[in-house]
Amino acid sequence: MAWVQIRLNSTDKQAEQISDFLEEIGAVSVTFMDSQDTPIFEPLPGETRLWGNTDVVGLFDAETDMKAIVEALIASRLVEADFVHKIEQIEDKDWEREWMDNFHPMQFGKRLWICPSWREVPDPNAVNVMLDPGLAFGTGTHPTTALCLQWLDSLDLTGKTVIDFGCGSGILAIAALKLGAKQAIGIDIDPQAILASGNNAEANGVADRLQLFLAKDQPQDLQADVVVANILAGPLKELAPNIITLVKPQGDLGLSGILATQAESVCEAYAPDFNLDPVVEKEEWCRITGVKK
C-alpha cells in the first residue's frame, strides 16, 4: 500500500492542535520532528516536548485528496492561508519493521544502557533499563535526557532516595533504581505520565520501590537524597522554592531541559541554596548540578 505525507512547520503551541486535527481528517499517523529530523523522545510533564522549530508530518493513504487536506487546514485557522508545506509520495514499506529497526540500545555513562525489549542486551552485566518506544520516544535520546542519565550514572546511588520531578515515562526514576537507589519517587502533573511510569517500572522489576504522585498530591514533607528535574527553564525557575525543599541537606540536585543560553538565569534561582558545579553543555542544551548547602 502506498502513502502520501504532508509536512508543515508549526509553533510549539499549535503543533499538538495540528496533530489532532490531521488525525480527525484521516491521517493514519502524525509525527513531530525537530529541524534536524529528530523524532521526539522524552515527554515533558503533561505534554509532548516540542522544539522551538517543530515540523508536523501527517501520513495519509495515497488515494487521499491532499488539496482537500490543505484546504481543511486553512479553514481550521490553525495555519495561515499561505502556509509553507511539502507533500510527497512515500514508497510502500514494512513500516512496523522499519520503525522497530530504528531503535537500538543506547549507553549513558559507564554502566547504564536503555534497551528496547525486542533488542538483545549488549552487555548482560551492565545496568540495563528496558524501555519500549511509545508515542514520544524517538530514534535517539534528546540531549537533556542523555545529560540526566549520564549524571545519574556518575553518582553512587546505593541506598539513596531519588525524586524524579516531572517524571514523564519514568526513565530517570527507573534508571536510578537500577543503578542502586533504595527508593524513587516520581512526580508529574499528567495522569498519563503516572500510568506510563508505573507500567515501565513493572517491566523493569522495580515497581515495588517506586512511588508515584500527581503534583497536586505530593506529600508536604517529601525529601530525597537526590532530585532530578528534566523540565523547562521557566518551570525550573518558577518552581525553584518547591524543588529546593525536596533536596535534603548535602543532597544532590540535577536540572535539565534548559537551553545553554538560559543557564545563567536558572543558576541564579538555585545558587543561594546550592554549591553549583560548572554547567555541562550538550548541543544547545545544558545540565546544572550541585550539592545543597
Curated annotation (Swiss-Prot):
Catalytic activity: L-lysyl-[protein] + 3 S-adenosyl-L-methionine = N(6),N(6),N(6)-trimethyl-L-lysyl-[protein] + 3 S-adenosyl-L-homocysteine + 3 H(+)
InterPro entries found in the cross-reference section: Ribosomal_L11_MeTrfase_PrmA, Ribosomal_PrmA_MeTrfase, SAM-dependent_MTases_sf
One record GO biological process: methylation
Signal peptide bounds: none
GO terms of molecular function: protein-lysine N-methyltransferase activity
EC number: 2.1.1.-
Keywords annotated in UniProt: Cytoplasm, Methyltransferase, S-adenosyl-L-methionine, Transferase
Binding residues annotated for S-adenosyl-L-methionine, in chain numbering: 145, 166, 188, 230
Pfam families referenced in this protein's UniProt entry, alphabetically: PrmA (PF06325)
Protein location: Cytoplasm
CC annotations in GO: cytosol
Disulfide bonds: none
Predominant location: cytoplasm
Protein family membership: Belongs to the methyltransferase superfamily. PrmA family.
NCBIfam families: prmA
Stored HAMAP family: Methyltr_PrmA
Purpose of the protein: Methylates ribosomal protein L11.
Descriptive protein name: Ribosomal protein L11 methyltransferase
Organism (species): Actinobacillus pleuropneumoniae serotype 7 (strain AP76)
